């Protein structure tokens, strides 16, 4: 590995780490909105705590993907072709999660807000789980041919260890969100998050 490759590898690693550090509490707050928050005021307080920052944090993912594409195009191509289904589901989750913030805001009924809050929670659980599933699969290794194409099937990279990795990343994001809410909120919601964390 040359010095330039090492430099870009570190940059991509820092960008993905920044994404998981900054976006992790967003996912955790979304999870807490459907599990810890029990009434309308607590849900609004939880979601309002990430309102100004959630979309900015996703820029780290775009930058990491762009840096990976620019510096390691074969890695990028193998990743996207080999983990196509998981990345597609992550993209669907990111779309639903982003739309949820706007649709909750413009929903005029309590039932509509409740539905979009549940969509936010489900997407917030699914996205870190799928990222953990994918990264654990990458760490385990996936079969590739001589041209760098991934020859794995769905069951090759979705196994017991990768599911454990997905659950671990999901729980880590939830813990991150619980701690964030314990710092940024007050009243009963703060006490509940502090107790669970």
For the regions a language model picked out, list residue spans one by one:
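Membrane-helix interfacial "entry" motifs
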Residues: 1, 41, 48, 74-81, ...
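N-terminal signal-anchor module of multipass membrane proteins
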Residues: 1-56, 62-65
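Helix-coil boundary and interhelical linker segments in multi-pass alpha-helical membrane proteins
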Residues: 1-12, 69-84, 136-162
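Alpha-helical transmembrane segments
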Residues: 8-19, 80-93, 121-125, 156-171
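Membrane-water interface of transmembrane alpha-helices
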Residues: 22-32, 91-103, 171-181
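Membrane-interface helix-loop-helix modules in multi-pass inner-membrane proteins
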Residues: 53-124, 145
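Long, contiguous internal "core" modules enriched in hydrophobic/ aromatic residues
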Residues: 103-197
């Amino acid at each position: 590995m040359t010095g330039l490759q090492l430099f870009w590898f570190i940059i991509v690693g820092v960008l993905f780490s920044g994404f998981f550090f900054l976006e992790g509490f967003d996912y955790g707050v979304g999870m807490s909105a459907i599990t810890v928050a029990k009434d309308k005021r607590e849900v609004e307080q939880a979601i309002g705590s990430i309102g100004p920052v959630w979309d900015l944090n996703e820029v780290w993912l775009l930058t990491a993907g762009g840096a990976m594409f620019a510096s390691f195009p074969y890695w990028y191509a193998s990743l996207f072709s080999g983990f196509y289904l998981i990345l597609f589901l992550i993209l669907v989750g990111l779309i639903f999660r982003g739309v949820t913030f706007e649709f909750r805001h413009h929903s005029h009924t309590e039932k509509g807000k409740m539905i979009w809050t549940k969509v936010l929670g489900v997407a917030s659980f699914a996205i870190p789980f799928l990222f953990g599933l994918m990264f654990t699969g990458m760490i385990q290794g996936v079969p590739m041919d001589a041209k760098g194409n991934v020859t794995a099937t769905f069951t090759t990279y979705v196994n017991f260890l990768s599911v454990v990795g997905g659950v671990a990343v999901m729980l880590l994001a939830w813990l991150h969100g619980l701690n964030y809410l314990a710092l940024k909120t007050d009243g009963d919601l703060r006490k509940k998050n502090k107790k669970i964390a």
